[in-house]
Amino acid sequence: MSSLALKIGSLLVRTLSKPIANTIKAQAKEHKAFRKACIEFAQWMHRAEFRITGINRAKSGGANVRLRPLNDAKAVDAGATFLSETFIFTVAGGAILFETWRARRKEKNRRDEVAEAILGLQHEIVRINEIMEKQFVLQKKKNELQSSTEEIDSTEKDFDELHKVILKVERELHTLRQNTPSQNEQAEATPSKEIPRETVSEKADHPPSSNTKSVSTG
């Protein structure tokens, strides 16, 4: 219910309370039991008012006055008037109390909403801090991984350079082996020193001469 509708409803109740009070006043004059209750209540109010005024009069030094009860017509009229005014006052007071209670409840709800919003913001701040911490850890790990990747790339480059050097050495060894003849090829390339057959046969057919013997004997 909106505040405007509530105020209009309260004004309507206050406006309707006046004719209702007049109806109560009329019923008090016509209804027997209601009339009796109004008379008793009006006489009680008259006595209470007289005592209060008598006390004030005595304090001010005035003369004592004898209490005279109200007649039935005045008592009924006074009682009915009091009841109607009491009804109007009750309706107006109830409307004021309801508006006050509604305003307090609205303020309490607003405070609760603000408290919930603050609590939600606090939880959001905690969640954001946790996310930032996780991002910091992830960034740190990312940096470490990037550093490791750079080291791996550098190592791979070193391996590539080493592999190139090895291939170069193997090619040079292969070239050197091709240019250097083997032992068998060297043996085949060296000529053999054979004694001619004719010389050997001549030595066998012609033994040493006698002159040679005499020289050797002497």
Swiss-Prot record:
Composition bias, Basic and acidic residues: 194-206
Comp. bias regions, Polar residues: 176-189, 208-218
Phylogenetic classification of the source organism: Eukaryota, Fungi, Dikarya, Ascomycota, Taphrinomycotina
Region (Disordered): 175-218
Name of the protein in its database record: OPA3-like protein
Family from the record: Belongs to the OPA3 family.
GO CC aspect terms: cytoplasm; mitochondrial outer membrane; mitochondrion
Coiled-coil portions: 129-179
GO annotation, biological process: regulation of lipid metabolic process
Keyword tags: Coiled coil
Pfam families: OPA3 (PF07047)
InterPro entries given in the database record: OPA3-like
